[in-house]
């Protein structure tokens, strides 16, 4: 039996999370055939909303093989990451992708596995497919995700969360972990192991925490920059959260809220991180 996999693509998607999946499932077919199994274990199709080609976030075009609405015989539907750089882009981006979200919502009664990687997990959250379930997402959006979707249990450090009909994976190339997991689940652990070896993919990753980057080094927010400069200039002294708050002209509670919003960490953790 051939497992039909729909690879969703849309304008602004992360191109590798479409093409790399097609490559990995193609390799799975080759290895399956070479080891006495089916040469057509997986069939992948690139699907867009209207069946027309789209442009990925890297500027390259992705041809479409069919429209999402015309594909009724899928076993798996895989949503790629969205090419965004900041939390402030979310509302506009999600509004543009509303037709896709509505289509995902309509998929809820179908007996298929739906997956999403990285920032694409927000599309599943918007669709309602994750309501009452556990999920993971890219590390830099985990706090925003939890704030937006309190009815979803965020597992921020996990590379992959499988709830049965819905699977989410973490940041960046976690789509490779996701593909290997599907091969393991739908074919065999042995085939997944061989694919991981052949493609030189670490199939044993369980946490994305080692890959996270402290946001104050990436953010250009004036408050965080001013705070970092002050802390670095006072590393030889005992620095308190209250002293930092005074320097920034606000109360400690306000500072705490601002840091959680901007840097996804407490002021105390911010200070300790710079000291290290």
State what each model feature region is.
Residues 154-167, 194, 198-201, 209-214:
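Conserved Rossmann-fold dehydrogenase catalytic segment
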Residues 143-146, 151-153, 200-204, 213-217:
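HhH-family (HhH-GPD) DNA N-glycosylase catalytic core used in base-excision repair
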Residues 1-114, 123-125, 184, 193, ...:
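Extended, subdomain-level signal for the structured scaffold at the beginning of enzyme domains
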Residues 162-198:
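Conserved anion/nucleotide-ligand pocket segment
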Residues 114-115, 136, 155, 167:
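Structural detector of well-ordered beta-strand residues that form the stable sheet scaffold
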Residues 131-158:
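A conserved active-site-flanking secondary-structure segment within enzyme catalytic domains
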